[in-house]
Amino acid sequence: MNEIRDILIGVDFGREVSQICYYDRKRQEPAEVSMKVGANLFENSTCVCCWGKNQEWSIGLEAEYFAREREGFLVENLFELCEEDQGVQVGEQYMEAWELAAVYIQGLIRFLGSMEPVKNTKCLAITVQRLNGKMVKNLQKACESCLWTTPRAFTTMLTASDQIFAAGMWDGSILKAMKCRFENCLPA
C-alpha cells in the first residue's frame, strides 16, 4: 500500500465474499488489496473463525482453514447475522452480530499493512448490496468498537439503490464508486 496517512478505505461487505481497497493518491485511483501475498486474490470469504485455546480469530480463507484443520468455530453467515441482528454461539461465548462484524472488519483492515489504521484513516466507506436498519446499527457498532469514533474517520454506507450504483453496477467491487465518493474527503 502506498498510503500511510489520511487513508481512504473502501470495504465491500458481501453475503458470501467481501473485499477491501484504498484510494491511492499518487495514481489518483482506488487500489485493490490482495488477500494473499503474491497473488491477485482480491475477494475474501465473509466469515470468521475462533480457534485455539487462546481464542484467536481469523477471517476469510484463514478462517476456513482453521475451522477445518484446528477444529475452530466457523461463522459463515456473517452478512445474514448483521442483516437480521442475530447473535450466535461461538464455542463457549455468545457473540452479537456487531461483535462478529468488528472482528471481520478489523481483520480486513490488517491487510492494508498500516501500523495504526484507526489513527491513520480519514474515511472508511462500507458498501452492502442491501441495507436495512439492523445492518446499519451492526456496522456502526462494529466500527465504534474498532475505535472509529474520532472526527478524523467516519463511515459511509451505500446501497444498490444509491445514485452511484444507479446503473446497477454493483458487482462486488467498490472501486468504480470509490473515486467519486472519496472526492469529498480529498483536500481541495
Model segments located where?
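N-terminal short leaders/motifs
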Residues: M1-D6, K141-S145
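Gly/Thr-rich phosphate-binding beta-strand-loop-beta motif of the actin/hexokinase/Hsp70
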Residues: N2-E32, A166-A188
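Flexible loop/turn segments at secondary-structure boundaries
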Residues: V17, N132-M135, I164-F165
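Phosphate-binding loop and its immediate beta->loop->alpha context
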Residues: K26-T149
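Generic detector of low-complexity/intrinsically disordered segments
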Residues: E43, E80, A160, A166-A167, ...
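Conserved phosphate-binding/catalytic loops in two-lobed NTP-binding clefts
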Residues: E144-F165
